[in-house]
Amino acid sequence: MTPSPDTALLGRLRDLLEPVAAGCGLHLEDVAVSPAGRRRRVRVTLDLADGPGALGSNDLADASRAVSAALDDADVVTGPYVLEVSTPGTDRPLTQPRHFRRAQGRLVTLTLAAGTHVSGRLLSADDDGIHVRTDAGATTTFAYADVATGRVEVELRHLEEG
């Protein structure tokens, strides 16, 4: 079975841009292509490779220039397009171990595979699962298989203290 043109394009873009992101010390989180009037919009989402921290605007600008140059050199996208390079943002669902490692120290809400919800501070994340100090004060360990998804809660007070 031959992949659709869109699937093939996304695969070529990912193959092209993963090493570009890695060369900038970043992780290629996602690539999407969508119509934008007479053009196409190429959205590239980059993140730090692992662990807590924030991707600075200067680093993102440098990576954006590297992505743009790679796209121009490879001529993978035919016709005019608009390039958008961004980070996942705080509303990204936490679905992979790397996402949880990136959110260490943050307040999170988890939806467990059993359907229940747990909120608390994400203390750590390792290869086996995550360790959360719940709102009730207990430290609980969850295996990744037991967590359907998670999300970071924006907390202004915590940012002001840190």
Curated annotation (Swiss-Prot):
Pfam families: DUF150_C (PF17384), RimP_N (PF02576). It comes from the Bacteria. Transmembrane segments: none annotated. GO terms for cellular component: cytosol. Disulfide bonds: none annotated. Keywords: Cytoplasm, Ribosome biogenesis. Belongs to the RimP family. PANTHER family: RIBOSOME MATURATION FACTOR RIMP. This is Ribosome maturation factor RimP. It comes from Beutenbergia cavernae (strain ATCC BAA-8 / DSM 12333 / CCUG 43141 / JCM 11478 / NBRC 16432 / NCIMB 13614 / HKI 0122). The lineage of its organism: Bacteria, Bacillati, Actinomycetota, Actinomycetes, Micrococcales.
